[in-house]
């Protein structure tokens, strides 16, 4: 298997960094609310990998945070408490430690996610045929 690399631009350092990724098809990407952890979904190996972000912006300490996700992980978003929302067979919600705490059943497999509305309490979800609007008690983490 060929190693894939991801280029990540971190604002603090204003430089791009290549992040070694030990499988193919890295897909979704998100940052923790404090900007200290980078999350990347892996479509081929059905994982979420986490990287620590050093002070200079370098991603280090790659680790598999979540494995054996049912379905093919695609989009990922983080709420203001650091919980991860992973679009796969349905939307799986994980704690920052990688423990599944909830799931949101969809009528079709979701592909990507975005926080929206004035309070960022709505998760917009794209799928094959529709874009869904899911009202949540959680609030999105604005990262971009």
In which residue ranges do the predicted regions lie?
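Blade/loop signatures of beta-propeller domains
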Residues: 1-10, 142-144
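Beta-rich, blade/repeat-based domains predominating
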Residues: 1-6, 15-40, 68-83, 87-88, ...
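Structural signal for beta-propeller blades
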Residues: 4-7, 46-48, 91-92, 131-133
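Blade-edge beta-strand/turn elements of extracellular beta-propeller
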Residues: 8-25, 52-69, 93-106
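Glycine- and Gly-Pro-enriched alpha-helical subdomains that act as flexible
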Residues: 30-51, 55-63
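Short loop/turn segments immediately following the C-termini of beta-strands
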Residues: 43, 53, 89, 128, ...
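Short loop/turn segments immediately following beta-strands, especially the blade-tip
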Residues: 51-58, 135-143
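Short glycine/proline-enriched turn or capping motifs at secondary-structure junctions
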Residues: 116-117, 121-142
